Regions:
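A short beta-strand-turn-helix
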Residues: 2-19, 59
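CheY-like receiver
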Residues: 11-12, 61-64, 97
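Conserved helix-turn-beta segment immediately C-terminal to the redox Cys motif
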Residues: 16-18, 35-53
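Short pre-active-site segment immediately N-terminal to redox-active cysteine/selenocysteine motifs
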Residues: 17, 24-27, 69
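Conserved redox-active cysteine motifs that mediate thiol-disulfide chemistry
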Residues: 23-36
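Adenine-nucleotide cofactor-binding loop residues
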Residues: 56
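Structural micro-motif
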Residues: 59, 65-74
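Non-catalytic, surface beta->alpha helical segment in thiol-disulfide oxidoreductase systems
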Residues: 77-104
């Protein structure tokens, strides 16, 4: 999963019709639980771009998107925020959100 920062974020999201951004921190236990789930789903859904943003390294992005708790996932469609989730989601719940992102 590619890590984004303030300089790369907007271009990456604009270039990705469907994208999921994981706002995380290296010290966050729940973030560490979510990472392998996202890595697995990334391999199963080549039509969705997956990115990560370290909130400690990119605090302006965290503020811009109102990140108050981590992990937070933001799903984007055509460059626009579609839905935001907070906390660890199970794989079936993530797949359901991706289906919603693709079809709604």
């Amino acid at each position: 999963m590619k890590e984004l920062n303030e300089q790369t974020f907007d271009q990456a999201i604009a270039a990705s019709p469907l994208a999921v951004v994981d706002f995380f921190a290296t010290w966050c236990g729940p973030c560490k639980m979510l990472a392998p789930i996202l890595d697995g789903i990334e391999g199963e859904t080549p039509d969705v771009a997956f990115y990560r943003v370290d909130v400690d390294q990119a605090p302006d992005l965290a503020r811009r998107f109102g990140i108050m708790s981590i992990p937070t996932l933001i799903f984007f469609r055509d460059g626009n925020e579609f839905v935001k989730t907070v906390g660890v989601l199970r794989k079936p719940d993530l797949l359901a959100k991706l289906t919603e992102l693709k079809t709604r």
